[in-house]
Amino acid sequence: IRDRSPSRGLGDVYKRQEGARYSAQWAGMPYPVYAGYKGQNDLSDDINVRSRTINYLSGGSVFNPKEPGLGVPLEMSMALHSDAGFRTDDRIVGTLGIYTTHFNDGKLAAGTDRYASRDLTDLFLTRLQQDIRSTFNADWTRRSMWNRNYSETRLPAVPSTIIELLSHQNFADMRLGHDPKFKFTASRALYKSILQYICTQHNKEYVVQPLPVNNFSVRFGKKRNTLELSWQGVDDPLEPTATPHEYIVYTRIGRGGFDNGVR
């Protein structure tokens, strides 16, 4: 759905692309979730709807038992941002983490201490710095961990953090930030942090997904009307649990569905 109304000052753009507030509306969130300011302040609604959507989705679950909602057991929240600010030398600004403990008597909705958000933040910052420094010739900076009053870390019913990954205003940060390999490394570090946090909370072992295969090729097979697939597994020097042991090849014919796979 598009809004071409000149009175709103909006361009020819999909509602879901106009920010979290309108994305939540068109995703079917209830009016109180996306319009707490009743249409008078889109900016504040856009900021708050992110947390309110989490609370509505998780409401009624064991992690948010007292709030009405859809009962989805969401265990944590991470808001990924980029930061402003620049340096006059060639140094990297780096990553900042934000959490909030001074709210609701220091408790989350399930009764957990809000310092769980600090633990979550620490995991993200540690993993990001380790993985980026190990992959790139860059002295990636771990900045502060702020215990401050931000909507995205105050309002969620579950442990939450804001990760200011890098400065979009600083040349040294963006020199890496535009590199697809950096984007993959940072994204994988975030994924590993989430996996480690959730498994630790449940006292479970975890296994990180292996890296994509290398040298993939397709050749005509020795038998008629057959193809031979070949590839090489890739070990992850940053994660010992990510060693590949086997692969599953799924097949589909035409527009049909994929089969159950062959190991």
Tell me what each language-model feature is:
Residues 12, 36-44, 65, 105-115, ...:
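Second-shell loop/turn segments in exported
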Residues 242-263:
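Recognizes extended acidic, P/S/T-rich segments that occur
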Residues 197-241:
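Pro/Thr/Ser/Gly-rich low-complexity, intrinsically disordered linker/stalk tracts
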Residues 61, 77-107, 135-204:
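Active-site-adjacent mobile loop/cap segments within catalytic or ligand-binding domains
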Residues 1-14:
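Single conserved hydrophobic/aromatic residue that forms the stacking wall/gate
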Residues 12-66:
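Functional beta-strand-loop-alpha-helix junction segments that form "active/interaction loops"
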Residues 113-146:
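Active-site-adjacent substrate-binding region
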Residues 26-32, 72-76, 157-161:
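Loop/turn elements at helix/coil->beta-strand transitions in domains of secreted/extracellular proteins
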